[in-house]
Curated annotation (Swiss-Prot):
It comes from the Bacteria. This is Cell division topological specificity factor. Keywords: Cell cycle, Cell division. It comes from Thermosynechococcus vestitus (strain NIES-2133 / IAM M-273 / BP-1). GO terms for biological process: cell division; regulation of division septum assembly.
Length: 106
């Protein structure tokens, strides 16, 4: 608790130049992938919904963004995890994917 307070007091906010640069990168990434802000918001909501089925997420520090270099665009999800909700054996398998054993046999 004290460490969090000290971190908040002594952590510098990024300069506006850095913030503007990150926003420009995001705009360029959106343009390259042709994702509208609505689609990105829906994607962010869906990712959080699915991940939340399995783990409890920390609300502070949640971030989903697009990052691009010259050749590729990546969706980056920073999802701080508090704890697991289910054991891995109890977690349901996605309907679109065969169980791990069947996938190896093919």
């Amino acid at each position: 608790m004290i460490s969090e307070l000290l971190e908040r007091l002594f952590t510098r906010t990024p300069p506006s130049r850095t913030t503007a640069k990150e926003r420009l990168k995001l705009v360029l990434a959106h343009d390259r992938t042709a994702l509208t802000p609505e689609i990105l918001d829906n994607l962010r909501r869906d990712i959080l919904e699915v991940v939340s089925r399995y783990v409890e997420l920390e609300t502070e520090g949640l971030a989903v963004s697009l990052e691009s270099d010259q050749r590729t665009t990546a969706l980056i999800a920073n999802l701080p995890i508090k704890r697991l909700k289910l054991s891995p054996e109890d977690a349901p398998l996605p309907e679109n994917f065969p169980p791990e054993n069947e996938a190896k046999e093919r």
